[in-house]
């Protein structure tokens, strides 16, 4: 009897407006990461969802990988001891292949600040690294410092980030995404 749930797997710049419309219709949502390309939009969606009884699920595909589930289990069962240092590296190369002049690329939207937000590297790749760090360790980030920049003169979005974190158990961590 009608639509019960929808999946949002569009460019991240579209997530907010699509999700907002379906929240208003009380339809359950499965949304690909990142939730939105702007913090303000994410907070607005959270506020809207809290006024409903819908399920709003955000997907992080790598947490389903058996290797990561096993790593999480090792940490959870204290098989490797207390986590003191965390290092996550997630280098990518697709922005090298996608140039502004390449109008045919299906990834071109990732080079548009209006679609992916001010920092493509954090919203599109950093979100994977951040989620994996939290998923495997079970720890929460309490402090963060980052240097974010673009390594390419051909694109206008950030495509490189060095991130330093302090976790809730005082462990230190680093994330490099590029």
Regions found by a protein language model. Give the residues of each.
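Predominantly a Rossmann-like dinucleotide-binding segment in NAD(P)-dependent oxidoreductases
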Residues: 63-147, 151-154
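A short helix->loop->beta-strand "cap" motif at the edges of active sites that frequently abuts
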Residues: 25-27, 52-54, 171
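Structural detector of well-ordered beta-strand residues that form the stable sheet scaffold
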Residues: 30, 55-57, 87, 110, ...
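Beta-loop-alpha module in the N-terminal Rossmann-like domain of NAD(P)-dependent dehydrogenases
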Residues: 1-48
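Short, Asp-centered acidic motifs that coordinate Mg2+ and/or phosphate
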Residues: 4-5, 85, 172
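Short strand-turn motif at the edge of the Rossmann-like AdoMet-binding core
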Residues: 33-34, 59-62, 90
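Rossmann-fold dehydrogenase core element
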Residues: 44-62, 82-86
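NAD(P)-dinucleotide binding in Rossmann-like oxidoreductases
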Residues: 151-158, 168-178
């Amino acid at each position: 009897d009608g639509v019960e749930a929808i999946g949002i797997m569009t460019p991240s710049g579209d997530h907010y407006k699509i999700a907002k419309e379906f929240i208003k219709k009380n339809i359950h949502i499965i949304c690909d990461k990142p939730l939105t390309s702007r913090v303000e939009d994410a907070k607005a969606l959270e506020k809207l969802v809290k006024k409903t009884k819908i399920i709003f699920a955000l997907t992080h595909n790598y947490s389903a990988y058996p290797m990561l589930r096993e790593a999480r289990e090792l940490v959870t069962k204290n098989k490797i001891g207390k986590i003191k240092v965390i290092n996550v590296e997630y280098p990518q190369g697709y922005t090298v292949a996608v140039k502004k002049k390449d109008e045919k690329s299906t990834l071109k939207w990732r080079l548009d600040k209006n679609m992916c937000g001010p920092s493509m590297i954090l919203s599109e790749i950093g979100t994977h690294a951040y989620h994996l760090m939290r998923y495997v360790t079970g720890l929460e980030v309490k402090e963060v410092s980052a240097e974010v920049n673009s390594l390419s003169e051909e694109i206008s979005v950030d495509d490189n980030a060095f991130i330093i974190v302090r976790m809730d158990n005082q462990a230190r961590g680093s994330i490099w995404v590029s």
